[in-house]
Design a protein with these regions (language model features):
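Cleavable N-terminal export/targeting peptides
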Residues: 1-27
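Short glycine/proline- and aromatic-enriched beta-strand/turn motifs that initiate or cap beta-hairpins
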Residues: 23-66, 76, 126, 194-202
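Residues that define the transmembrane beta-barrel architecture of outer-membrane proteins
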Residues: 26, 52-58, 95-101, 118, ...
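Transmembrane beta-barrel strands of outer-membrane/channel proteins
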Residues: 32-40, 74-78, 122-128, 155, ...
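Extracellular loop and loop/strand-boundary signature of outer-membrane beta-barrel proteins
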Residues: 44-50, 86-94, 134-142, 181-187
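Gram-negative (and chloroplast) outer-membrane scaffold detector with strong preference
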Residues: 61-136, 146, 160, 196-201
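Predominantly the C-terminal beta-signal and adjacent terminal strand-loop region
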Residues: 81-85, 157-203
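A charged, solvent-exposed segment within the mature domains of Sec-exported extracytoplasmic proteins
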Residues: 131-177
Length: 203
């Protein structure tokens, strides 16, 4: 049976994580984070023209990274009120949101080079973006799940204790799908960037 787009995206995400070859002395980190979403764009029914507005974002990552170059992560982001524009008359009911979930591969500066300081890294991953919203009359109800990719850069270090540190992260999320003019595919494009600061916790 042919795989759906979402199934293929999920399998590709798992393959990216699996292809990140483990190295000796790897550490596992939990990273709860918070920050700001900015620079968004979408063809989904954005009735309040809010996609490009700044909004609060939060989430968490699980990162596996040793002293070498390669690592991998699972990343989850949550953006409440993604379709809410404070400068516009309310159209959507409270509670709209966008979430993203992805698996990714990290390329980090080796610990031997940074000497225990901030370790810069780059990350690329694939996964899914889900958008949910409904207008006050429930005429337009948004329920979209689309495959997407993430690219980003950041830096992290255990600066506070041997097991607690900080992570700075900037990444861009963009759907693979676009709008080709057919009715079935209209409203499936979404992109945004986010800057977050996270608490780095070695498990």
């Amino acid at each position: 049976m042919p795989l759906s787009v979402l199934q293929r995206a999920t399998l590709l995400s798992l393959m990216l994580v699996a292809l990140a070859t483990p190295v000796r002395a790897q550490d596992i980190f939990a990273v709860p984070f918070a920050g700001v979403k900015f620079g968004g764009s979408t063809s989904i029914f954005d009735l309040e023209f809010a996609a490009d507005k700044k909004t609060f974002t939060m989430g968490a990552s699980v990162v596996v990274l040793g002293n070498g170059v390669f690592g991998y992560e699972v990343d989850f982001g949550y953006m409440p009120n993604f379709f809410k524009n404070e400068e516009s008359p309310p159209v959507y009911k409270p509670g709209s949101y966008v979430i993203d979930l992805s698996g990714g591969v990290l390329l980090a500066l080796p610990a031997a080079v940074t000497g225990g300081g901030l370790r810069p890294y780059a990350v690329v991953g694939v996964g899914l973006v889900n958008a949910q919203a409904a207008d006050v009359l429930e005429i337009f109800q948004i329920r979209r799940t689309v495959p997407a990719f993430k690219i980003g850069i950041g830096a992290q270090a255990l600066l506070l204790t041997n097991n607690v540190g900080i992570r700075f992260d900037l990444r861009h999320v963009r759907s693979f799908t676009g709008d080709d003019g057919s009715l079935a595919r209209v409203g499936r494009r979404i992109s945004y960037s986010r800057f977050t600061v996270g608490l780095l916790l070695r498990l």
